[in-house]
Structure formats: structure tokens, C-alpha cells
């Protein structure tokens, strides 16, 4: 018997989305970003499904080690870089590449005793102002990295966009110009484009692109849908109705008696709540798909359950499937109702939600 709630992950969708990104950037290799448990889709499952990706991007060393332990042989890159000097031995042992974005990392590399140099990606702060070396110090830092015997040559180069998900914002064009001016005539691979870069900024498609959310069929742009760009949603979050109740006009439901029925209706109780990662702050009216129609959430989302208004004439039954998001109820639209972004919804699912690869 299939567990509820569960996140059903489509192999077909994942493979389609990777192929679509290859189409959009035919001259670039694809570093599939699978951090945060594959954006909630299952780290190892996603990496094994995307076995024709050219490499994988992770946030933490533990994620990279999990892929190696699972038999993944492809290029792995730590996008946040390493945190401790002791990590360097592990990087060498498991052939894991790292971003270098801060003076402290350079000092650790210079002082380390390694039996093999580490492949690094020097991060340029071209305008995001979060991580990376600012333009004024770029050439000095680059020469310092060249002089370090613990760093493999050539040095790879990267940056990250602040506003690529705003196609009409010229911030991205300025960042591209800053990066290209600094790195012209230098050797090494380059990567600029995240999902939004790959979709909307063709000039950012360098030797590598590193899509994240687009791999999972979701648009990086608020108010947009991944399906408009040939992507297929990879996750369907489902649960079931565990109770159906006749509800009289004037009666409240849920904690705080937050919602009161204006007319007689039927309410359905769905087995999912904030203990599963569904947002407690989902407002009244947030849609849930029941038997092909949208039923609005009424009352507050609780730890294990939420309640929907099925309507007075509802013919639904206990045990019927409830879709919280998926191909017929895009996660982008649910995120808009809740006032967040799809990234947050898919990555915040808790271990109580079974992740099932079809």
C-alpha cells in the first residue's frame, strides 16, 4: 500500500527537463544542482535519474559524500565551498571540486598538506554581494590562487546572478559584463547561468550552466509556469481524505475558530499539515485538487491535517486522493496563494512525507 502523504517523483519529467535545458544551451555542459535533497525530490534518486548530466552541484560536503556513497561518479562541485581545513583531505579523497569565495579558504588551501591538488572554481562577486571576490581584488586573488600548489590548474571561474529571474531587469546584463571583462583571456571553465540564466539570458550560457529549480519543472520567475518553457513538473504532492463531515452555516472549524461557514456545506479533512512541511500560513482559499476540482482550504492548517470546503453537493469519499500540488495544480500557483516561492514549498517537506520515484 502506498503511504500518505507522499511526493510522487516522475523520472520522465526529470529526464525531459534535463533534455530541455540541453536544448536551450546546446554548447554548454549541464551541472545539475541537486542540493537540499534534490530540491525535496530525493538527492540520490534525482542524481541517478539524471545520469547523463555532466556534473552535479551541491551545497554541503555531506551531500556530495552521499552521492559518492551511492555510486555517482560524475563531477561534483560544492557551491558554498568547503568550511573547514579538514574538509580538504576529503575533497581530494573523493574527487570533489569546490568553489573558493573567501580569504579564509585561500589560507586553508595554502597551509594544507595534500597528496593531490584540489580543483577550484573562483567565485567573482559581479553584483550579488553575497559571496565572492569583488572586482577590485580579483586579479590579486587570481594570482594568489595560481601560486598555490594545492590548487589544480587552470582555475575555473564563476559568478551568481541576483536578478536573472527578472528578465526585464538590466542587473543581469551588467553582471555578465563585469564578469566577462574581469575574466577575458584567462583559461579555465566558466559558469554564470542558473535556471533563470539558462531560460532567459542566452549570453550567460558559458562552458557550463548550473540549473536547479528548472530541472524539477518549476519556473524561477514569480507568476510564471515551467510548462511555458517546455518543462514538466517532477513532483506531485498527494495525500487523502480521512473524513468528510456535514457542516452547518454558522459553524466554525479548526483552531481558533478561524473560519465560519456562511452556508451549509461538506468539509473534507486531508491528512497533511505543517508537520509534513505544508505551510501553516496557507491562507483561506488556498486550493487543493480533489477529484479533478479545486477545493479551498478553510480554517487553519494544523500539524497533521488541513480542512477543505468540498461544497454542499460533494460526492467525494473517504480515501479519495488529495493533490496539494502537481501537474494539474502547479506548485508555482500554490506558492502565489501562500505568498512564498515554489523553491520553499518543495524543499521544506519533512521526513514524514515519503518520496516515491515512479
Swiss-Prot record:
GO cellular component, one term: cytosol
Reactions mediated catalytically: L-alanine = D-alanine
Amino-acid positions noted as binding substrate in the UniProt annotation, renumbered to this chain: 130, 303
N6-(pyridoxal phosphate)lysine carried by residues: 35
InterPro entries: Ala_racemase, Ala_racemase/Decarboxylase_C, Ala_racemase_C, Ala_racemase_N, Ala_racemase_pyridoxalP-BS, PLP-binding_barrel
SMART domains: Ala_racemase_C
Catalytic residues identified in the record: 35 (proton acceptor), 255 (proton acceptor)
One of the GO biological process terms: D-alanine biosynthetic process
Pfam entry (one): Ala_racemase_N
Disulfide bonds: none
Protein's pathway: Amino-acid biosynthesis; D-alanine biosynthesis; D-alanine from L-alanine: step 1/1
Keyword field: Isomerase, Pyridoxal phosphate
Coiled coil spans: none
CDD domains from the UniProt entry: PLPDE_III_AR_proteobact (cd06827)
EC annotation from Swiss-Prot or TrEMBL: 5.1.1.1
Molecular function GO labels: alanine racemase activity; pyridoxal phosphate binding
Cofactor (UniProt): pyridoxal 5'-phosphate
Summary of the function given for this chain in its UniProt record: Catalyzes the interconversion of L-alanine and D-alanine. May also act on other amino acids.
Stated name of the protein: Alanine racemase
Biological source species: Shewanella pealeana (strain ATCC 700345 / ANG-SQ1)
Amino acid at each position: 500500500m502506498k503511504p500518505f502523504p507522499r511526493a510522487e517523483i516522475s523520472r520522465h519529467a526529470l529526464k525531459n527537463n534535463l533534455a530541455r535545458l540541453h536544448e536551450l544551451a546546446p554548447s554548454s555542459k549541464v551541472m545539475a544542482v541537486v542540493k537540499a535533497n534534490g530540491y525535496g525530490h530525493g538527492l540520490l534518486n534525482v542524481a541517478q535519474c539524471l545520469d547523463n548530466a555532466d556534473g552535479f552541484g551541491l551545497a554541503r560536503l555531506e551531500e556530495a559524500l552521499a552521492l559518492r556513497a551511492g555510486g555517482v561518479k560524475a563531477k561534483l562541485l560544492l557551491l558554498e565551498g568547503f568550511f573547514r581545513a579538514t574538509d580538504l583531505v576529503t575533497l581530494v579523497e573523493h574527487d570533489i571540486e569546490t568553489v573558493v569565495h573567501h580569504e579564509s579558504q585561500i589560507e586553508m588551501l595554502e597551509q594544507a598538506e595534500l597528496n593531490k591538488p584540489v580543483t577550484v572554481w573562483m567565485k567573482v562577486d559581479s553584483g550579488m554581494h553575497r559571496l565572492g571576490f569583488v572586482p577590485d581584488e580579483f586579479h590579486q586573488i587570481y594570482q594568489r590562487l595560481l601560486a598555490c600548489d594545492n590548487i589544480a590548474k587552470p582555475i575555473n571561474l564563476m559568478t551568481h546572478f541576483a536578478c536573472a529571474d527578472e528578465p526585464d531587469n538590466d542587473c543581469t546584463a551588467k553582471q555578465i559584463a563585469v564578469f566577462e571583462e574581469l575574466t577575458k583571456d584567462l583559461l579555465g571553465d566558466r559558469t554564470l547561468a542558473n535556471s533563470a540564466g539558462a531560460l532567459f539570458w542566452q549570453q550567460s550560457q558559458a562552458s557550463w550552466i548550473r540549473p536547479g529549480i528548472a530541472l524539477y519543472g518549476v519556473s524561477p520567475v514569480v507568476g510564471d509556469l515551467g510548462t511555458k518553457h517546455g518543462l514538466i513538473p517532477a513532483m506531485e504532492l498527494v495525500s487523502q481524505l480521512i473524513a468528510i463531515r456535514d457542516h452547518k452555516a454558522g459553524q466554525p472549524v479548526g483552531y481558533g475558530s478561524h473560519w465560519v461557514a456562511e452556508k451549509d456545506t461538506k468539509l473534507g479533512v486531508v491528512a497533511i499539515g505543517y508537520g509534513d512541511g505544508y505551510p501553516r500560513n496557507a491562507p483561506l482559499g488556498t486550493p487543493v485538487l480533489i477529484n479533478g476540482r479545486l477545493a479551498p482550504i478553510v480554517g487553519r492548517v494544523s500539524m497533521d491535517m488541513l480542512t477543505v470546503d468540498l461544497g454542499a453537493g460533494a460526492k467525494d469519499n473517504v480515501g479519495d486522493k488529495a493533490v496539494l500540488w502537481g501537474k494539474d495544480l502547479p506548485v508555482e500557483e500554490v506558492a502565489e496563494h501562500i505568498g512564498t516561492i515554489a523553491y520553499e514549498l518543495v524543499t521544506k517537506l519533512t521526513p514524514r512525507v515519503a518520496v516515491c520515484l515512479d
